[in-house]
Structure formats: C-alpha cells, structure tokens
Swiss-Prot record:
It comes from the Eukaryota. It is found in: Vacuole membrane. Keywords: Glycoprotein, Membrane, Transmembrane, Transmembrane helix, Vacuole. It comes from Candida glabrata (strain ATCC 2001 / BCRC 20586 / JCM 3761 / NBRC 0622 / NRRL Y-65 / CBS 138). This is Topoisomerase I damage affected protein 7. It is a single-pass membrane protein. The gene is TDA7. Residues 533-543 have a biased composition (Low complexity). The keyword S-adenosyl-L-methionine does not apply. The chain crosses the membrane at residues 489-509.
C-alpha cells in the first residue's frame, strides 16, 4: 500500500516507537517519492535493516545480486540478474544500508546529502565519503554507505567529476548533490589531461565498440540513484539508475556515456522468469523497468492513489518540477519474502545537458579543468504550478472500498484501514487518504464498520495525525472520558433545573386554584323581575312605619255645657291632650255612653273635629271607608 503523507513537525520518536510496539503498525521507510507504505501483515510486520548489491563476473557478464536483510524474522531474500560488463566497473561491490527507522532521530534526518567517491591510483581502490545536513522534518532517510572496489588497473590519469543527483520520484524533496571520482582503465593511450580525452570523444576517434571493449566506465549508476525500502512488509525494493550525460555541458566536454546507444544498453538486461520489460521512449531518453516475481504464486491486488507532488504545509516553499512518475509494482508471498524491482529511468543518448533540464526547472552548470575534474552544480529551482501523479500498487487493496486489516495484541484488537479525508482550512483545501487504526477491547461487545464516504475535517486533525497525537489510544481514551464527564454534567444540570421548575410550578398552580374567589352576578332575567317588583309591589312599604299614614283623630267627647266648645276652665295643654286622645280613639272606646251624644248628634255618624275644629259632614276630608277603618 502506497500512501501520500508528510511531516511538518518533528514527532517524538519515543511515542512513535511505543505506538509501533503497541499496535504493530509500522510505517514504512519513506522514500523520496513522498510515499509511505503500510504493511498488510499487521501481526508480523517485517523491518528491513539493510540492502546489499553484489556484482560478480561470470562469462563476460556481471551478475547483480540483491540481498535484503529482515531483522524481524532474521531472514534474507536474494535476487539476481545479469547485466553486461560494460555497465558496471570490473569486480565492484556496492552496499546500501539505510539505518532502522526506529533508531533515526527525527531531527537528524538530512535535508541534503553529498556523496564523494575518489580513487586511489596506488591502492586501486575507490573511497566513498558522505556528508549530509539536517533540517528536513520527516521520516525520509538519506543515510547510505556505498563502498566500491576495483581489481582492474588504474591509469596514471584519473578523471574526477561531479554531478547532481536527481531527487527521485519526489520533486519537493530538497536537492541532493553527489560528487564522485573514479579511475579509468582503458586500452586507449594515456592522456595527460581531461581536455584531451574530451577532444578524442568529440572527434569520434573512439568507436562505440572500442569504448565498450576498453571498459571506459564511470560509476554512472551513482549519478542519480535512489533506493526505496519499505520496512513494514510492502516487500518491494527499487534501485533506480539514471544514466544521464550531465558530465558534459559543451561540445568539448567528456562524452563517454553518449556513445552507449539505447539498444546496446537494453540488450544487456537478461529476461528472468516471470519478469516484464517496459520501454517507453521519451525524446532522447528511455525507461526500462524490470519486475521480477517470486517463484511461489501469490494473489495480487491493485490500487491507485493520486498524490500531490508537494507536501502540504511543509517548511519548504519551493516547488520542483517532478519527474515522470513510474508505476511501482510490489507483491507479497506466503513467507513474506521480498521481491526486487529494478527501474532504469532516464537513459540518455545525448551528450548535452538537455536531459537534466527535464528534472530541474533551472540549473547552473560550471566546468573547470583544475586537477582533471569537472564540477557541476545547480541552483534551487524556481516555483512552478504543482501537478499530480498517479502511483499504482499491487500489494494490497486498501482504498475506500478496500478491506479492513485486523490484528490482536494482548487484550485489544486493532483494525487498520485507509480513510479519505477532506482537509479544510481558511486558505486552502486538499483531499488525502490517511491510515487509521481503531482499537477495541476483546471483553467488550462491539460492531465495527469502516466509513464509506469522505470525511470532512479541519486542519487541526491533520496536524495531530502528522505529529502522532492521534496514535496514542490512552490519550484518546482520556479525552473521550473527559468529554463524557463534561457532557454528563451539563445534561444533568439542565435536567435537574427543569425538574425543580416543574415542581414549583405545580405547587403554585395548585395553591392558586384552591384560593381562587369567583365573582357573583345576577342573571339578567332575575334582575328584570326584581326591578319590576320594586315598582309594582303594593306591600313594599308594609313594615316601614315611618312612611305609614297615621289614622285620623276620633271625634271629641260630648260636653253638656257647651257642645262643640271646650270649657274655659280647661287649659291649653288639656285641650291638646283631649284632642289627641279623641283623634287617635274611636267613639266606641270612650268612657262616655252613647246617651251623652244622642242629643247633639244630627247624623248617623259624628266625625270629630281636626285640631279642635268642628268637621263638616257636608265636605268630609276623609273617605267613608277610611273613617270606618
């Protein structure tokens, strides 16, 4: 599985090692192609410590043997192929040993690397030295040691040259400059200077066959070589040799490699069983790809990912023109043995430096003949628009619709899958696929399913993934536990407040209903009846004695001396009292007898005077019936 990723901050190597030990998820060795391989064998991820290339002679051909050491299973895998003797120096051996990923401090990973190869005439040996500077924060390791020895004779004159190594498949990796020098053994008459050899080559005095037979070779394979090691079971190795004529920048410079034709170089590679050769000419360059398969049959799955050529949010602000990205194939077998893959990219048949312009946007070349050497250097490329490249892998199908890998470690089970994320920020948005590992406890019952759609998240999640903060299961557990506590507290507080409010409201409403006073009012029909009765009731003032009309005064008693005239001897008070007594008394109630009034009575009824006045029977003031009552 090849996956796009980058690191912009130096992650803690201790946390990375602990995560590798706990979850058995070992990130592969990150090559210059900005790719990370993730192992399909989570239970037993292989970790390759070193890779060696042995070159031996057999029947005028060189046998290139590649050996990979697996420090996990303490096993090694060896693959051999035959190459013509003209490609490599006579009897040389090269070892490429990148250090283990766990032992490399992140801060010491070099940004640029310089390899110097010098030859010693007396000892007939080639000395290799390497210098590197570190400021690039990622898992890209350029540490390598290349040793080469030669058994052939070294002429008195040695050619020292310098060239710039191509950054490989990743254009955004800082440029790596490699300088080397090698001896030349040839049947051609010795020359005194580099310029004379250059003139011989430019005048075509040396034929192509003469060049091949004279073994005029330079370690061109070191000019632009990259070793791609996947430490976690991706089981693929790529050794790229870029044969380019960057040794020359003018028509008078050395043009040794330009005499080697494409057809002669292609014929030097012998087809192995189950191998394929791909030739894709591009102008003056050809690409040869030899892919050897294991003897045991294995099921292959292919997946394709489109990755940007620039690391998002990296410290570098420069863009590099990317190389034509080859298709990297890898396969696994039942014994997790390593398969080798050889990709010879950029075979140049031109003696000019035009091929180097394909790899770099701008370059500055300088040539000097001091101490018989040529030095080439190139400035930092200019900024161009980014492009995308497609990398195909046949190792394991872990795309969005791919399978989910599981591994049991202790009391936990781990699920690993590839999830596509849409990272959004304030100024940029990009889409990337990230490997995700989810852990569950074996004692708990759970159901796990991989998200099927693209997850949109912010830049904070992406930075946490790069720094390794998401790799700690304990930290995630603590965060989730704290989040659950906070959420529970908030929900409990809200629910408690609602319950208290409901209780208070219930008692308040109940008390209000109990003490509520209803207002009384008369029915309209009854009000009309009462009003009518008040006006027409004859007995309304029956018991109101103050408004009752007093009865009339009874007539005065008979006085024999003077009828109708009160005696003079009676005072005013007696007159009034008698009058009052007569007024409110009936005749029948007086003490006098009816004989006393018989003489003076002129009518059937004698009406007494009112207020001492004699009433007239002709015009009575009161009605007859009223008087009787």
């Amino acid at each position: 599985m090849i996956h796009n990723s980058s690191y912009t901050e130096a992650a803690d190597i201790k946390s990375l090692s602990s995560f590798i030990e706990e979850s058995s998820r070992v990130p592969d060795y990150i090559s210059e192609s900005n790719n990370i391989g993730w192992s399909s064998n989570i239970n037993n991820p292989p970790l390759f410590e070193s890779s060696s290339f042995d070159i031996t002679t057999q029947n005028d051909n060189w046998i290139l043997t590649e050996t990979m050491q697996n420090i996990t299973t303490e096993s090694s895998s060896t693959f051999s192929r035959s190459v013509a003797s003209s490609v490599f120096p006579s009897s040389s051996q090269a070892f490429v040993s990148p250090p283990s990923i766990i032992d490399i401090p992140i801060s010491s990973i070099p940004e640029s690397s310089s390899i110097s190869i010098s030859s010693d005439v007396l000892s007939s040996a080639i000395t290799v030295s390497q210098t590197s500077s570190s400021s690039y924060s990622s898992l890209i390791s350029s540490y390598s040691t290349i040793q080469s020895t030669s058994s052939s004779s070294i002429s008195e004159n040695e050619i020292s040259s310098s060239s710039r190594i191509s950054p490989g498949l990743l254009s955004s990796v800082p440029s790596i400059t490699t300088s080397f020098s090698s001896g030349i053994s040839s049947s051609v008459s010795p020359t005194s200077s580099l310029q004379q050899i250059a003139e011989q080559s430019s005048n075509s005095s040396l034929a192509e066959n003469d060049l091949l037979s004279s073994s005029l070779t330079i370690l061109s394979s070191v000019l632009s070589s990259s070793v791609l090691l996947h430490n976690s079971g991706v089981s693929s190795s790529s050794f790229t040799d870029n044969f380019s004529s960057t040794l020359t920048n003018s028509s008078n410079s050395l043009a040794i490699l330009s005499s080697i034709s494409e057809s002669s170089l292609i014929n030097t590679i012998t087809d192995l069983p189950s191998s394929s050769v791909l030739l894709s000419p591009n102008n003056s360059e050809s690409s040869i790809k030899v892919s050897s398969a294991s003897s045991s049959s294995s099921r292959r799955k292919a997946s394709t990912y489109t990755t940007p050529s620039r690391i998002p949010f990296s410290n570098s602000s420069e863009w590099y023109t990317p190389l034509p990205t080859p298709s990297i194939s890898s396969s696994t077998n039942d014994t997790s043995s390593l398969l080798s893959e050889l990709a010879l990219i950029g075979i140049s048949s031109s003696s000019s430096s035009s091929s180097s312009s394909q790899f770099y946007t701008s370059s500055t070349s300088s040539s000097s003949l001091v101490s018989s050497s040529e030095n080439y250097s190139s400035s930092q490329p200019t900024t161009i628009e980014p492009i995308t490249s497609t990398i195909s892998s046949s190792y394991s199908d872990l795309s969005n619709d791919g399978e989910i890998l599981s591994s049991t470690l202790g009391k936990s089970v781990y699920y690993s899958y590839i999830q596509t994320f849409d990272i959004t920020a304030s100024t940029t948005t990009f889409e990337t696929a990230l490997p995700i590992v989810t852990a569950f406890n074996l004692k708990d019952s759970y159901t796990f399913s991989k998200p099927s759609s693209i997850i949109t998240t912010d830049l904070h999640f992406y930075k946490d993934w790069l720094s390794g903060a998401l790799d700690s299961n304990e930290e995630n557990g603590n965060k989730s536990k704290n989040a659950g506590t906070i959420a529970g507290s908030v929900v409990g507080s809200v629910v408690g407040l609602l319950v208290c409010t409901l209780i208070v409201w219930y008692f308040y409403i109940r008390k209000r209903r109990r003490n509520q006073k209803w207002k009384s009012f008369e029915v309209p029909s009854r009000s009309k009846d009462v009003e009518y009765n008040n006006n027409d009731n004859p007995f309304n003032n029956e018991f109101d004695f103050q408004h009752r009309v007093p009865p009339p005064l009874p007539p005065q008693r008979k006085n024999h001396n003077s009828i109708g005239v009160p005696p003079s001897s009676m005072g005013l008070s007696n007159t009034r009292s008698a009058d009052y007594h007569m007024r409110f008394s009936y005749i029948s109630s007086s003490t006098d007898s009816s004989d006393d009034y018989s003489d003076s009575m002129q009518s059937a009824l004698h009406i007494g005077s009112d207020s001492g006045r004699e009433r007239s029977n002709d015009v009575p003031e009161m009605g007859y019936l009223r008087e009787i009552i």
